């Protein structure tokens, strides 16, 4: 979070994504998909979330759609305009949440370029109430909810996932017992990302507690430019 607040991390990747053309993004992604396929992966969930502006979020989702059409890998797209409040909206968070819900989502729905909606519910990103607003708007536009929750601080993201019946909650490194209980009741899949914990030197999510509580557990790479360079599910 310190790196992010200093303009690095997600914001740095956002700046690079905005400057890149669709062709440049597709070439970079295609190379990563080739490597994933070499490790035996045949289906990938790909998220937007590094555009953080309508034009660039749609650009990323269009690239995912084109790759699904032309690459051997099967891709499933997730809209994640609520990954971070971008620098230009730091003093007007409410307007950015409105932009995500009232401008981006209708266009995503109209173009049919995403199946899921995700939000990063965490300290210094989106509050529980902001996350609720985003995910409920996603449901309105036919986007099934997912949530990044309890990665650094347990602020209530896993409980929100259970309340909304999200398809999955990601990270969950510091997921509390109340969050596990809520996910079990809501039928939420805990999508754990241990390669990120490994890369950051962080603790691992309480997977055994989740299994014992009846929460279905899945794992993924969390391949991204900032916190996890891993493309290999065999390592995960």
Predicted regions and their residues:
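Structural recognition of alpha->loop->beta junctions
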Residues: 94-115, 160-178, 214-217
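Metal-coordinating catalytic core of metallo-dependent amide/deamination hydrolases
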Residues: 8-30, 34, 42-155
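Catalytic beta/alpha-barrel core
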Residues: 118-123, 144-151, 166-176, 193-198
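Structural detector of well-ordered beta-strand residues that form the stable sheet scaffold
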Residues: 76-78, 146-148, 170, 189-191, ...
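Short acidic active-site motifs
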Residues: 156-157, 178-179, 205-206
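His/Asp/Glu-enriched, well-ordered alpha-helical/loop segment
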Residues: 138-145, 162-164, 192-195, 201-236
């Amino acid at each position: 979070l310190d790196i992010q607040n200093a303009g690095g991390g997600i914001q740095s990747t956002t700046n690079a994504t905005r400057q890149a053309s669709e062709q440049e993004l597709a070439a970079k992604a295609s190379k990563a998909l080739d490597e994933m396929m070499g490790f035996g992966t045949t289906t990938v969930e790909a998220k937007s979330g590094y555009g953080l502006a309508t034009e660039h979020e749609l650009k990323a989702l269009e690239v995912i759609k084109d790759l699904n059409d032309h690459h051997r890998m099967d891709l499933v797209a997730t809209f994640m305009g609520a990954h971070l409040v971008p620098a230009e909206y730091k003093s007007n968070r409410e307007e950015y949440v409105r932009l995500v819900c009232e401008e981006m989502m209708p266009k995503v729905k109209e173009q049919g370029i995403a199946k899921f909606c995700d939000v990063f519910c965490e300290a210094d990103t989106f509050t529980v109430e902001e996350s609720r607003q985003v995910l409920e708007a996603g449901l309105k536009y036919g986007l099934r909810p997912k949530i990044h929750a309890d990665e650094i601080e347990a602020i209530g993201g896993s409980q929100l996932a259970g309340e909304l019946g999200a398809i999955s909650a990601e990270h969950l490194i510091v997921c509390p017992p109340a969050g596990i209980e809520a996910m079990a009741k809501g039928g939420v899949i805990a999508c754990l990302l241990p390669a990120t914990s490994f890369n950051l030197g962080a603790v691992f999510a309480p997977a055994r507690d989740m299994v014992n509580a009846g929460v279905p557990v899945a794992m993924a790479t969390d391949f991204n430019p900032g916190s996890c360079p891993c493309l290999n599910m065999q390592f995960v």
